[in-house]
């Protein structure tokens, strides 16, 4: 029930912001979650979900801070970074190169070490490759 309320509030904010931005002629980012990314978010504690969705919303509104949304080195993968109660949540994503304002979130992890696991980056790159192959 709480998830539905949070989602509705987030959608209402997105709708109102999109109306304002359309009137002002501002291009807004759109973040799309894959099923796996959505399942990851749904499995997290409610307060952590709120914080992750809040960070996604901030990026959609154009806040591009490195502590929230960062490009990983030597790759086309980006990560949404959320720290809540000492736990680091990462949501991997990539830009749709045909639509400048579309970001696809592939999957997420709870980060336990300082270094981002290479297998998770490879997984995100594979999903990206699949996405573009299916678009052709």
What name fits each language-model region?
Residues 105-106:
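Conserved catalytic cores of phosphodiester-cleaving nucleases, focusing on short active-site segments
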């Amino acid at each position: 029930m709480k998830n539905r309320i949070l989602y509705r509030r987030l959608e209402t904010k997105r709708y109102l912001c999109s109306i304002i931005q359309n009137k002002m002629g501002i291009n807004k980012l759109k973040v799309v979650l894959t099923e796996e990314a959505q399942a990851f978010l749904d499995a997290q504690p409610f307060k952590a979900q709120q914080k992750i969705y809040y960070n996604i919303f901030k990026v959609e509104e154009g806040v591009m801070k490195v502590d929230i949304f960062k490009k990983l080195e030597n790759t086309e993968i980006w990560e949404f970074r959320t720290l809540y109660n000492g736990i680091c949540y990462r949501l991997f994503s990539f830009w749709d190169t045909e639509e400048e304002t579309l970001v696809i979130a592939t999957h997420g992890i709870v980060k336990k070490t300082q270094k981002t696991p290479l297998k998770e980056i490879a997984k995100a790159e594979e999903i990206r490759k699949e996405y573009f192959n299916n678009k052709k």
